Amino acid sequence: MDDAKNSAVDVLEKQAAFLSSALPYMQKYENETVVVKYGGHAMGDPALGRAFARDIALLKQSGINPVVVHGGGPQIAEILMKMGIESRFENGLRVTDERIVEVVEMVLAGSINKEIVALINAEGEWAIGLCGKDGNMVFAEKAYRTVIDPDSHIERVLDLGFVGEPIEVDRTLLDLLACSEMIPVLAPVAPGRDGKTYNINADIFAGAIAGALEAKRLLFLTDVPGVLDKQGKLLKELTVSEAEKLIKNGTISGGMIPKVETCVKALQNGVEGVVILNGKTPHSVLLELFTEQGVGTLIVS
């Protein structure tokens, strides 16, 4: 019995120590904006989803203004399969035709968005689900991708349909929500000036939002610990120039390249620091913001 009691006391002491050590970081981020891109494995795990929602609620209770941007690629693919809609790919990238973009909007701005809102509201906060269409928050234009043909080595342009890139962000609505103690949860769907609807990569959307809000931090929750060196060791902090060198020498490769490039663009647009971290770690948002060492890779100018 005494051992059990002592063990319980030890746990409480550790919790109290963490809260005490977090105070200077809470003060550091008070009244600041933190944009969190929520995606990857964490979105499909109910326990991690609840932990994430509690983290966001705690940020708000600590005087921080969190803004959540979410993805939903696997969920979109699942619904398309159930509806019998075949996806067409160009060089590994899904072509979003008029029928598919309707499904994308339904899944992202509908079911996924409202699930996240409900999780945060269950923690006693006041979250609201939006997309780029609401309040003319974001306008997009059609995005094109260029690839090098492996056989001819000739560059060609890919038309991916209703895939867009943000070109304008109006922060007015987001500022009003922050003043109203509300937490925006944003789906990466936006209108174009041409009246069409565009699906936007969630990382790019989050970077544009963070830049417009001049966020203190932009956090990318991924399925990896952060940027790794060639030995697989986590790199705790990088400058933009260091990150660019790592891309050139092949240390940063594959899917991490566009993510780091998005980080760099966000920094150029006014974000103070961008962090790539593992969303599969419970409470990774708190561990990154409220501890000295953090748990991901911080990229700064």
UniProtKB/Swiss-Prot annotation:
GO annotation terms (biological process): arginine biosynthetic process via ornithine; L-arginine biosynthetic process
Entry keyword ATP-binding: yes
InterPro entries: AceGlu_kinase-like_sf (IPR036393), AcgluKinase_fam (IPR004662), ArgB (IPR037528), Asp/Glu/Uridylate_kinase (IPR001048), Glu/AcGlu_kinase (IPR001057), NAGK-C (IPR041727)
Reactions catalysed, as given in the entry: N-acetyl-L-glutamate + ATP = N-acetyl-L-glutamyl 5-phosphate + ADP
Binding site for substrate: 72-73, 94, 199
Site annotation Transition state stabilizer: residues: 37, 259
Keywords: Amino-acid biosynthesis, Arginine biosynthesis, ATP-binding, Cytoplasm, Kinase, Nucleotide-binding, Transferase
Keyword Transferase: yes
Stated family: Belongs to the acetylglutamate kinase family. ArgB subfamily.
Family matches, as PANTHER family: N-ACETYLGLUTAMATE SYNTHASE, N-ACETYLGLUTAMATE SYNTHASE, MITOCHONDRIAL
Function of the molecule: Catalyzes the ATP-dependent phosphorylation of N-acetyl-L-glutamate.
Protein name: Acetylglutamate kinase
Natural source organism: Bartonella tribocorum (strain CIP 105476 / IBS 506)
